[in-house]
Amino acid sequence: MKVIKHSFDGVIVGAGGAGLRAAIEAAPHMKLAVITKLYPTRSHTGAAQGGMSAALANVEEDNWNWHSFDTVKGSDYLADQPAVDILCKEAIDSVVELEHWGLPFSRLENGKIAQRRFGGHTVKEGEAPAFRACYAADRTGHMILQTLYQKCVSMGVTFFDEFQVLDIKIDDGVCKGVVAYEIATGDIHVFEARAVTFATGGFGKIYKVSSNAHSLTGDGPGILYQKGIPLEDMEFYQFHPTGIYRLGILLSEAARGEGGILRNKDGERFMERYAPSIKDLAPRDMVSRAIATEISEGNGAGPNNDFVYLDLTHLGAETIKQKLPDITDFVRTYVKIEPIDEPIPVQPTAHYAMGGIPTDVDARVLSDANGTILPGVYSAGESACVSVHGANRLGTNSLLDIVVFGKRAGQSMVDYVSSTKPFSLSENAGEDLKNKINNFIEKEHDPNFSVPKIREELQDSMEENAKIFRLSLIHI
């Protein structure tokens, strides 16, 4: 196991939407490296289906103040309202910027970017559902990821693919770089850097049934927590109402935005009882609680009464084919159901972390409850908590979040690097991590030590005690 040293001005950890957008902003102004444990286009941003909200008003009257109102209300009024205003105000230019970079948005007949309804988004502060979500069929995240990655490639951004960052170097309260493990060789790589942005995504794999990929293990928050940085809003975890039964694979809100209906075992459109005005397009927390309530009251479907149905059969084959192609392919592949003819079994699935690394609106990491800035360290996207989502995120605001605050993280890196001088880390900067890895490898031979068992026990405990309704303390 070798220790290899690199020197950069800035490092971005993670190559999903937030990391790539930060790289686009920072790369022209510094020597920059993007370190990712996956190939960039395999990042989880690509799994996002439904859309990215912005008050473009292409279909009907809209403005960013209404978007902001909905976001704050949907958060149970626990979001940071100045940050929400920034998110919603900058959304419009962010969508236009992506369009100019080549993102193939779906279009209206007049050529403008198409927009559709999404849960919790309304016009005139709750009067009716809003057509606000800009989309590319039902593969919006995939298109955003591809567009941002191609922009990075065209700019000559340096990538270190399949490197897992395991540690950050902070000396005297100042960032000095990161240490990573090269997955292919087992070598340790030390990256000197004055500025580091964590854009490592969420941590949904703490749950057994999750929409998250296996790679979403909370790397960024975990690394900083071990350095004494307190995490924010960790109790707020979103459960998406419509995951494929038992699998957790997400069926986007786009399906309900196009007219899909949730039904219980009796075929009743039960959301009419829980949200009479917006029904199936209520915010995700409300819909997930409604489904959980239906199941607990014996109205769930199936032999165990533990799921409900998402009914698309009334939409027609042409609408399903044109607007929901990926969603319906998932259903055909994984549950062998033809959604044109049969309703789909769904259940709430662990989906999105509202909490994470505390930051200000410029993506600067805060090291304590007083808002003290940790010099040179930034975070954006799901790994960060700014907090624009409060206790519940509205659908389509996550893709918006990564672009708006990814850009701000890149700008902050540029400002910081331009005002500081280069330095050198000690020659043995990676030795402590090397020793930890060797000790871990030796421990693997202990029959009483099993990483898979620890993970399974964690997932079982979270699944039982920390889902939609939490009635007891967790004991691990």
Kindly label every feature range from the protein language model.
Residues 1-8, 17, 25, 39-41, ...:
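Glycine- and aromatic-enriched mobile tails/lids
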Residues 6-8, 186-195, 373-374:
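Core beta-strand elements of the Rossmann-like FAD/NAD(P) dinucleotide-binding domain
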Residues 10-34:
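N-terminal Rossmann-like FAD-binding beta1-loop-alpha1 element of flavoenzymes
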Residues 54-87:
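Glycine-rich active-site loop/strand segments that organize a redox cofactor
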Residues 99-187, 192, 199, 240-247, ...:
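Conserved redox-cofactor binding core of oxidoreductases
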Residues 166-175, 180-181, 323-384:
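A glycine-rich dinucleotide-binding beta-alpha-beta segment and adjacent secondary-structure elements
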Residues 195-249, 395-408:
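Glycine-rich loop(s) and the adjacent beta-strand/alpha-helix scaffold that form part
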Residues 223, 229-345, 412-418, 455, ...:
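An anion/pyrophosphate-binding glycine-rich loop and adjacent beta-alpha core
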